[in-house]
Amino acid sequence: MSSVVIVGSQWGDEGKGKMTDYLSQEADVVVRSQGGNNAGHTIAFDGKKFALRLVPSGIFAKDKLAVIGNGVVINPPALLKELHYLQDNGIDISGLRISSRSHITFPYHILLDKCQEEAKGDHKVGTTKNGIGPTYMDKVSRVGIRMCDLLEKDTFKEKLERNLAEKNELFTKLYHVDPISFDDIFESYYEYGQELKQYVTDTAQIVNDALDQDKKVLFEGAQGVMLDVDQGTYPYVTASNPIAGGVCTGVGVGPNKIETVVGICKAYSTRVGAGPFPTELTDEIGDQIRETGHEYGTVTGRPRRVGWFDSVAMRHARRVSGISCLSLNLLDVLTGLKTVKICTSYKLDGKQIDYYPASLKELERCEPVYEELPGWDEDITGAKKFEDLPINAQNYLKRVSELSESPLATVSVGADRIQTIIVKDPWEFAHK
């Protein structure tokens, strides 16, 4: 058995897709376990850039299975749009597998998401308004419609009628918007299900069988640890569990099947939307990093908030997600800065702390304590091994690793797959 879990160790957008694409070359199965079409990932493949939201990045690897696990919430028209887009670009999608237990996002989830966000006024969470939270809300309320229900016309009809009756009460009486018609959803979504039916199966069995047969399984995360509904900056979080533990529930594998957890991070920090962000840069350095790193959301297009690398948040991510090693991206973006900073701890009400507070009010009062290191001007985009990097870049990476309490596995110095320095292949950590 050999398994690797990829988790975003910051606030999402860390470049998980690139590492998934790289590691999937050796994997037999690539699995996604949570999130929905709120999570965008961009992959450079064969000279083209592909922006995906639902389809696992492993779809680009030939002769592999790309699995959407039960923890993923699926918007059928959005998924079909992606599949057609891939086919139009010559990508073979025959390896796709979709869990029959995955939950479905409907138009009423999207409308409810928008209504709830607007009702929050100045306290908006900053959701993508794709209906992800309301879909998970129905799931835990035990009224959700799953993929297996969508394929059974009578079951789908019964559940849709019941859900719409409840949701339309909310729309008309609480939010004062027009109700959603049953006829606008039923036939079209049933047809979506029929088109997806060929890919629907018991994915937990597929993944467990692969592990039991000593095949390599790669679990692809979405979002990031700091957006985890339990361990992140609640309530400014996503509705699912991006931590490594979410793989177990979101795929249907036991924790003893998880061998290695790769924490994906940037050489700096970013987040989209509202919420605490202790190392945020609002000056010209932040603007420079944003423009050089093209820091705009894959899904929303919103400019990302930018900050220095936060080792306090990283250590929190390591603890709650069991990170084995780090895969650091976008080191090249820091090229040209005279100095680079790493947050080593916080000051809370004058007292130095090295933990990440749960309280939002405490986080707002936290001041980052920085360690400053000299920067570098040399072009690093062609570096093939660690020793090719300027000494100042090497020292920066070593300090990030030390403060994060995690060894470096890879360093990315450019967008292309080949622009990756392998310090130690993450698959090797599975056999330590």
Curated annotation (Swiss-Prot):
CC per GO annotation: cytoplasm
A matching Pfam family: Adenylsucc_synt
Cofactor(s), by name: Mg(2+)
CDD domains recorded: AdSS
Top-rank taxon, per record: Bacteria
Family: Belongs to the adenylosuccinate synthetase family.
Protein known as: Adenylosuccinate synthetase
Gene: purA
